[in-house]
């Protein structure tokens, strides 16, 4: 007799869970109760769900599970940043990072085991690509981190918090391993769970999707679930961006900027964040700043300058701090809202661009990288 694989409830958004409970003879309010137990109270035992009928709990125990990915390693940085390495099977692992600050707690989650975009300055891209994560594996990172952090630091924080500061995790950014918009069908239900009042109850302004510029899926996200958007820009012209972000060859800057403008009509914020990794001698000259100013004036945006975090075999160097300061000042003098990201967790390789996990590459990206990364990047101006 064949056994039916239990359904992992972490992978179901409100509609999917309501439909499932309905198939089992339950009412919609039962699905809402169940969703609150799973995502708000971080419960993984159906026996603990005391306001559910006993026979329904028994049914759940037979047919469903609440199961996050196994954690292989947890690391803590001297600055309070925490990183988890989750086992996704078959020799692959992904990384998730929690960044505590005085006014917020940000969780950076992954959407793929590896990444096919292969940005030149990103450690994840250097590892290659294995597979997309399932919704349960994406939301499971949030579920696990919330559960662990509330147990570890939640009580102390909540005791001293005001009414508006009761969350350990107040912001979620999809800036970990992978390109979220190339795993859209699994990412979308995860986003909806983050926003759902019976799920994690985050506002659209506090959930950010970062993309390297998958234009058609940016348009879909604007219609389906318009959260805050960050775009990995990293170059002010097509010639240089073709080298740094190969996806630019498919969706060049003109198309990308037009998609950003369309997204703004639906976005929860009145600007797009452009991320710009500062690379010594590559994209950090005064001429690059001049070109970037011209680009930034075409769409309402904020520039986030990111110090490059080196990794083996990158062949790249971080821009010196004085150069970053001058570059940022030129942008601000031109009226462009500009911030310089503070590096967090670099002592545990948890900073921007350092997440690598463990990836069994199915795309031969690592082989191609061995050849291509020996070729110097041209310092290109428009």
UniProtKB/Swiss-Prot annotation:
Disulfide bonds join 108-352. Keywords: 4Fe-4S, Cytoplasm, Disulfide bond, Iron, Iron-sulfur, Metal-binding, Methyltransferase, rRNA processing, S-adenosyl-L-methionine, Transferase, tRNA processing. [4Fe-4S] cluster binds at residues 115, 119, 122. It catalyses: adenosine(2503) in 23S rRNA + 2 reduced [2Fe-2S]-[ferredoxin] + 2 S-adenosyl-L-methionine = 2-methyladenosine(2503) in 23S rRNA + 5'-deoxyadenosine + L-methionine + 2 oxidized [2Fe-2S]-[ferredoxin] + S-adenosyl-L-homocysteine; adenosine(37) in tRNA + 2 reduced [2Fe-2S]-[ferredoxin] + 2 S-adenosyl-L-methionine = 2-methyladenosine(37) in tRNA + 5'-deoxyadenosine + L-methionine + 2 oxidized [2Fe-2S]-[ferredoxin] + S-adenosyl-L-homocysteine. It comes from the Bacteria. The active site is at 95 (proton acceptor), 352 (s-methylcysteine intermediate). GO terms for biological process: rRNA base methylation; tRNA methylation. Reaction proceeds by a ping-pong mechanism involving intermediate methylation of a conserved cysteine residue. Belongs to the radical SAM superfamily. RlmN family. This is Dual-specificity RNA methyltransferase RlmN.
């Amino acid at each position: 007799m064949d056994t039916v694989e239990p359904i992992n409830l972490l992978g179901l958004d409100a509609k999917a869970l309501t439909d499932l409970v309905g198939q089992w003879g339950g009412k919609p309010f039962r699905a809402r109760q169940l969703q609150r137990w799973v995502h708000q109270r971080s419960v993984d035992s159906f026996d603990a769900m005391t306001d559910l009928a006993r026979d329904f709990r028994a049914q759940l125990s037979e047919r469903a599970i609440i199961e996050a990915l196994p954690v292989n390693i947890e690391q803590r940085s001297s600055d309070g940043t925490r990183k988890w390495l989750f086992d996704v099977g078959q020799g692959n692992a992904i990384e998730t990072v929690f960044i505590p600050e005085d006014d917020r707690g940000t969780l950076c989650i992954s959407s793929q085991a590896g990444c096919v975009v292969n940005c030149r300055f990103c450690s994840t891209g250097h590892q290659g690509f294995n597979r997309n994560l399932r919704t349960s594996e994406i939301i499971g990172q949030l579920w696990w981190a919330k559960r662990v952090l509330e147990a570890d630091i939640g009580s102390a924080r909540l005791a001293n918090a005001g009414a508006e500061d009761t969350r350990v995790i107040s912001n979620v950014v999809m800036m970990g391993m992978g390109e979220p918009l190339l795993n859209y069908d699994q990412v979308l239900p995860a986003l909806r769970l983050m926003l759902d009042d019976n799920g994690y109850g985050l506002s659209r302004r506090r959930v950010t999707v970062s993309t390297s510029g998958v234009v058609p899926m940016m348009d879909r996200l604007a219609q389906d679930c318009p959260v805050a958007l960050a775009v990995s820009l990293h170059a002010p012209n097509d010639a240089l961006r073709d080298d740094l972000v190969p996806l630019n060859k498919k969706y060049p800057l003109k198309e990308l900027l037009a998609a950003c403008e369309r997204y703004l009509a639906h976005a929860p914020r009145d600007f797009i964040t452009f991320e710009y990794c500062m690379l010594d001698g590559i994209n950090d000259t005064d001429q690059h700043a001049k070109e970037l100013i011209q680009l930034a004036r075409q769409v309402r945006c904020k520039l986030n300058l990111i110090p490059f975090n080196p990794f083996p075999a990158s062949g790249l160097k971080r821009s010196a701090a004085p150069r970053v300061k001058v570059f940022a000042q030129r942008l601000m003098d031109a009226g462009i809202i500009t911030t310089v990201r503070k590096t967090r967790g670099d002592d545990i390789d948890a900073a921007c661009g350092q997440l690598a996990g463990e990836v069994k590459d199915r795309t031969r990206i690592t082989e191609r990288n061995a050849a291509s990364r020996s070729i110097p990047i041209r310092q290109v101006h428009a």
